Amino acid sequence: MPTSSRSHRRAADISRRQLLAGASAGAAALFLERGGLHAQAPAGSTVVFSHTTVVNVDAVQNDVALAVEGDKIAAIGPTDQILQRYPRAEVYDGRGKALFPGLVNCHAHLAATLERGFNEDFGFPNSAKLSVRPGSLLQGEEATLMVTIGALEALRTGTTTIVENTGGIARSAAALAKTGLRCVFAESVRDSENVPGPMSPEGLTKSETPKFSAKLRDEGLQRIDELFSKWHGANQGRITVFPAAALAETASPELLKAVRAFAEKHDLGYTIHLSQSMAEVDFMVRHHGLRPPAFLDKHGFLGPRLFAAHCRYVNDADIALLGKSRTIVSHQAAMAANRGVIPPIPALRAAGCPIANGTDNNTNDLFEVMRVALLTERIRRDDPFPGVRPQPEDALEDATMGGARAVRQEKLVGSLEVGKKADLLVLDTQRAHLEPAGRIVSAWIHNGQASDIESSMVDGQFIMRNRKVLTMDEAGIIAEADRVGKRIWGQVEAAGPVAIPGRTRRR
């Protein structure tokens, strides 16, 4: 692991001549102290991360350099050789740092940031009996503000690619594009007139045979087409658009076929929420005579282009269908645990389902999700000798290459390889909770913090550098979100009593 003569040192530019001269550690430390912060590298320039550690799932290279030229990784190798190859490059001192692939968040609802600190404690679907929904009180551009602060959290915590899965993405698309994140806009549609979703136990008792509307279906498909026409491939290819059916319980066979057809026509992936509650499963059996995966299979929706969100309540037959079809599962480990559920990821993986991960609601910290995924899968496995499978490298793979496969960009992102996009994280390893460490991947996932991330790049451009976000007004966004949140929650409380669970145990 690379070392540094001073903890928490700000990265500074070092000339090629000084590095090649083999300056002593003391001289290097003095130079670093006198150096200033990096300026943002201009588009198309070359940046060399020197004397650093390059981390991939299957290999960790110590004391090497990684060169970024334009938007791609151009070279990885010994620092002196890389600097000789790129004599005009800007040099980012990598001593005491490790480069990780950027994380790929395959399932997010960024606007739900509004309800964090409340939504997490009422089960799923939310059982709180509020007189008014907080989201209905947003005014003007405030919904976009909630999306933006969610994206800000995602950026700070290591995400470089994010799938925003909701309806009406056009309203916040421009703001998301400006964050610098690689985005997949999964425009979500439904065509049921009389099925509220997601299904709840209360909704199930009142449910009736679904009625589907061609008008709703056509409007939703038009939204997908318009979003695709305007945004797919925008911002030098950073933005892609996928179609999405919202929920199994709100989708007709015709909608499912149309979503898949759109994806196949344009060589895209597509997504849906699947088997996320027992109420959903019971609804589908009651009104369609099939469990959710079987319903999707009957209508040709399963397959390797599909990444299904959740799959918490699946039985052996469901798992067999998903595995046989090579459907990808994005399981949102932290939110599942929050709901008191551990999805059967070992069985899904064994059946043939590629696995990815996401954040879902309220929180957008995929780094924390990696750790929860590792620990909850160890519990779910119930191995005779526990605590060995999965390994931290498995959790990292699901959050990087697993996500890249789900969004059909595995040839572009998900690992640090020559020719791939320069989507990467710079981790400061000189931290009390990371040193000493036998394995950097294990140390970070078990003991690390998102704040260990010093800088991040997307498309070869820094979107955060030396812990300063470069693409958004962080302080302004936080202050405005605080103001709006206080107003809205004040209105919620004024509209009627809010039953807060509070402490559930008494002596």
Roles of regions detected by a PLM:
Residues 2-64, 68-72, 79, 85, ...:
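Active-site microenvironment of metallo-dependent hydrolases
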Residues 52, 66, 71, 96, ...:
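Divalent metal-coordination and catalytic microenvironments
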Residues 114-145, 152, 187-215, 278-305, ...:
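Active-site gating loops and adjacent loop-to-helix segments of metal-dependent hydrolytic enzymes
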Residues 116-181, 220-236, 482-484:
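Alpha-helical scaffold segments that flank or form the walls of functional sites
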Residues 174-312:
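Metal-coordinating catalytic core of metallo-dependent amide/deamination hydrolases
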Residues 180-182, 264-267, 301-304, 321-330, ...:
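Glycine-enriched alpha-helix->loop->beta-strand junction motifs that scaffold or abut catalytic
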Residues 298-305, 346-431, 447-450:
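His/Asp/Glu-enriched, well-ordered alpha-helical/loop segment
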